[in-house]
Amino acid sequence: MTDTWLIVGLGNPGSEYSNNRHNVGQMVLDELASRMGGKFKVHKARAQVVEGRLGIGGPRVVLAKPMTYMNVSGGPVAGLCNFFDIAPDHVIAVHDEIDIPFNTVKLKMGGGEGGHNGLRDISKALATKDYLRVRVGVGRPPGRMETADYVLRDFATAEKKELPFLLDEAADAVELLMDQGLLAAQQKHHPAKA
């Protein structure tokens, strides 16, 4: 196995979904690609990828946006792991999380998928839940709105003003996770409650 990291931004393909809450993982990857000065190119594993290094002397990374719908992201992720010889413990899935308030980023290794079908499909395709997750909070749906309706809508106007800061924080979390490990990244992004 190589020391290369696979960073996967979960979302749905197509311009009609690009600004949805469900696509916040892919928005974070756009920020990381911008930092690398890279452009996404189509890979045979059914994903758009950018290969390179994050920062001077930083780790070798493959940024990937599956070209499949969110709920069937596992095939492209497993295909990229095989192609680039990347172990599951060097996979970081960046995804929306309704159980975390908007404008909050949390990190974890493994565990349950919390009803997130994209994560469930990745776990199945990798035959393990032991990969890293950067969970980008989008908040819970208001009132009795269905979760699917909520995550497949664009961010609210007030949220759009804060979104660049959230994407920046999530991209920083990905970099810190690779550079200093899970515990250091959690300590920075999971502030202690007073």
From Swiss-Prot:
Keywords on record: Cytoplasm, Hydrolase, RNA-binding, tRNA-binding
GO CC annotations, alphabetized: cytoplasm
CDD domains in UniProt: PTH (cd00462)
InterPro entries linked to this entry: Pept_tRNA_hydro (IPR001328), Pept_tRNA_hydro_CS (IPR018171), Pept_tRNA_hydro_sf (IPR036416)
Membrane-spanning residues: none
Record: residues binding tRNA: 17, 69, 71, 117
UniProt EC number: 3.1.1.29
Pfam families: Pept_tRNA_hydro
Active site as annotated: 22 (proton acceptor)
Enzyme class: hydrolase
Subcellular location: Cytoplasm
Residues with site note (Stabilizes the basic form of H active site to accept a proton): 96
GO molecular function list: peptidyl-tRNA hydrolase activity; tRNA binding
Catalytic activity from the UniProt record: an N-acyl-L-alpha-aminoacyl-tRNA + H2O = an N-acyl-L-amino acid + a tRNA + H(+)
Site (Discriminates between blocked and unblocked aminoacyl-tRNA): 12
Domain of life: Bacteria
Entry's Gene Ontology BP terms: protein quality control for misfolded or incompletely synthesized proteins; rescue of stalled ribosome
Oligomer and partners: Monomer.
Function: Hydrolyzes ribosome-free peptidyl-tRNAs (with 1 or more amino acids incorporated), which drop off the ribosome during protein synthesis, or as a result of ribosome stalling.
Family membership: Belongs to the PTH family.
Name of protein: Peptidyl-tRNA hydrolase
Gene source species: Paenarthrobacter aurescens (strain TC1)
